[in-house]
């Protein structure tokens, strides 16, 4: 930018050198031996699909579906080389779907209580099995997933899968339960709304009724199906996954799921012992000891069995869906038992209420939580043009004591794609935000598959609307398919811009994995520069990261119409 004084870069170095003062520096724990983690979330059934038909509500035969086996040695090596330490395989567990697998002893699901044709991965139907869609041979689907775990480990990465303790599919049916394990609800007393050891809550005296559809919606887009009759047999009706107590949930409720009972009474009272306040500062072993010998609700035991089962199968970490809807005492019970047996397990939770962050970290023994409500929302507003970078220092200050636990991301399966018109409108505009998101804290970085090649999520898959890649239907992901290039996984069909974008991500993520400074101290220099540097404004953000051995100045320009120069001579001089 013409006429701008670039002295702020030299000031940044000077400030960094003088940052011994406790009043001026936001200190983080010195974790220099550890390095940043990078989690690559992949929607498993979409990853290897190279079919380009993309028919709304299309079947797996029409639109295609990816398989576990598509993650071959070459594909996994390319993901690892992108700068990835962990893969979160989303949609692995057997969930409700419309596709017919009765030939394999699996009951059909009712389209009236399934979102999309392929189904939501968060409406789990059988916790001890995997999605038959993902197997070349559905009869051997567990063996194929176990082989994928092994291939992933051989490429130097760890495996994360989802556990969804808050709810299950409306038509839960455990066909693969280990010996001694009973289905959810199998022993419930359905004559009462609530009982501690019931797995579900009930709407006494009322049958379940399918929601009244809105805005022209109908299951499967109106296609005829023998089970799509506007009814689903459930008597008495159960509470819905998001907590709705209506026998006829709204279309915007999580009507395809049923809420799990964790011993929380309908009036909010608890039928389990609460943790003493001082347990917020006690380690997982103390928590594990606390729960030994105590009676806990049946649902606690069921989900503990599930989590331990998958960790024994070789999974390295668990991502807990909607964790804040489950009492923190359960997380203390579960996670302390996990850490006692699998101390290296990575435990990531979806929590959106900032008032709960510290309890779920300290009492619930979570390793990481989503940093959405503050960091993601703020930086998205900046990218969209109406947020100011002035807000970011405050956001970081608010989580200073827990910043290492706050996972950063710009995309995931719930959020809009960066190039979509409702976010940035282009992948290029996301670059400054990605730099800040990846480098501002010691927390892990999450990247959603095809983010690195600028996927806009523009397809109409059926259920839901574009801007997000569908998690409900069979669909192709065009930019990702160009990277797959006929399953060569070499990026051979990418455009020049897509290749450049992927190289940007590869450089940034690998740097973050290897940088000592990114696990060291942080200080914002934004306000210092804004007060003293002509031309520096609310569209620029700057901060420093350092350890004794490595010092970084990080500056991001969010204004696509203005450019700034850096004098490396001055930088070297300092």
Which ranges hold each PLM region?
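C-terminal motif of bacterial Sec signal peptides marking the signal peptidase cleavage site
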Residues: 17-18
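N-terminal structural segment of carbohydrate-active enzymes
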Residues: 24-158, 166-168, 172-176, 188-189, ...
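Hydrophobic faces of well-ordered beta-strands that scaffold small-molecule active sites
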Residues: 38-40, 87, 159-161, 318, ...
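Conserved, mostly hydrophobic/aromatic
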Residues: 42, 89, 127, 162, ...
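Loop/helix patches that line or flank the sugar-binding groove of alpha-linked glycan CAZymes
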Residues: 97, 400-403, 409-412, 417-572
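Substrate-binding cleft/loops of secretory-pathway carbohydrate-active enzymes
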Residues: 169-170, 175-178, 331, 352-381, ...
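Active-site region of glycoside hydrolase catalytic domains
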Residues: 169-281, 400-404, 434-446
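Active-site neighborhood of glycoside hydrolase catalytic domains
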Residues: 279-355
């Amino acid at each position: 930018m013409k006429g701008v004084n670039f002295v702020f870069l030299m000031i940044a170095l000077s400030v960094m050198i003088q940052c011994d003062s406790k009043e001026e520096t936001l200190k983080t724990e010195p974790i220099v031996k550890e390095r940043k983690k990078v989690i690559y979330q992949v929607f498993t059934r979409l990853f290897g699909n190279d079919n380009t038909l993309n028919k709304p509500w299309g079947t797996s035969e029409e639109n295609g579906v990816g398989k576990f086996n598509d993650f071959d040695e070459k594909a996994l090596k390319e993901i690892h080389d992108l700068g990835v330490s962990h893969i979160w395989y989303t949609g692995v567990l057997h969930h409700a779907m419309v596709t017919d697998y009765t030939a394999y002893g699996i009951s059909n699901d009712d389209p009236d209580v399934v979102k999309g044709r392929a189904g939501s991965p968060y409406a789990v139907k059988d916790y001890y099995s995997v999605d038959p869609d993902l197997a070349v041979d559905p009869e051997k689907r567990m063996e194929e997933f176990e082989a994928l775990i092994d291939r992933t480990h051989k490429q130097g990465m760890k495996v994360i899968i989802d556990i969804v303790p808050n709810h299950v599919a409306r038509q839960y049916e455990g066909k693969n339960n280990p010996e001694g394990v009973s289905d959810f609800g199998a022993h419930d007393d359905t004559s009462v709304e609530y009982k501690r050891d019931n797995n579900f809550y009930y709407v006494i005296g009322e049958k379940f009724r399918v929601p009244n559809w809105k805005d022209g919606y109908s299951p499967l887009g109106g296609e005829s199906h023998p089970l799509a009759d506007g009814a689903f047999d459930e008597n008495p009706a159960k509470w819905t996954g998001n907590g709705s107590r209506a026998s006829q949930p709204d279309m915007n409720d999580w009507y395809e799921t049923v809420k799990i009972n964790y011993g929380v009474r309908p009036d909010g009272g608890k039928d389990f012992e609460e943790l003493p306040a001082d347990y917020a500062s006690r380690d997982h072993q103390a928590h594990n000891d606390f729960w030994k010998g105590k009676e806990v609700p049946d649902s606690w035991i069921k989900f503990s069995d599930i989590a331990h089962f998958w960790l024994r199968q070789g999974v390295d970490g668990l991502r807990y869906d909607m964790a804040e809807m489950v009492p923190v005492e359960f997380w203390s019970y579960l996670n302390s038992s996990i850490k006692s047996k699998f101390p290296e397990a990575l435990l990531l939770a979806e929590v959106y209420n900032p008032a709960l962050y510290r309890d779920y970290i300290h009492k619930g023994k979570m390793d990481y939580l989503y940093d959405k409500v503050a960091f993601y929302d703020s930086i998205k507003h900046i990218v969209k043009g109406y947020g100011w970078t002035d807000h970011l220092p405050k956001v970081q200050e608010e989580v200073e004591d827990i910043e290492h636990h706050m996972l950063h991301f710009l995309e995931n399966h719930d959020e809009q794609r960066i190039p979509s018109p409702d976010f940035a409108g282009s992948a290029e505009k996301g670059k400054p935000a990605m730099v800040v998101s990846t480098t501002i804290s010691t927390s892990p970085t999450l990247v959603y598959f095809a983010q690195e090649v600028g996927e806009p999520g523009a397809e109409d898959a059926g259920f839901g609307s574009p801007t997000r890649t569908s998690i409900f239907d069979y669909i192709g992901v065009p930019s990702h398919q160009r990277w797959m290039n006929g399953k060569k996984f070499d990026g051979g069909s990418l455009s020049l811009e897509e290749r450049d974008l992927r190289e940007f991500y590869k450089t940034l993520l690998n740097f973050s994995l290897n940088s000592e400074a990114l696990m060291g101290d942080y200080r914002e220099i934004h306000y210092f520069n804004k007060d003293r540097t002509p031309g520096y404004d609310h569209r620029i953000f700057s901060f420093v990261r350092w350890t004794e051995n490595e010092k970084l100045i990080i500056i991001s320009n969010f204004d696509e119409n203005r450019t700034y120069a850096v004098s490396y001579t001055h930088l070297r001089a300092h």
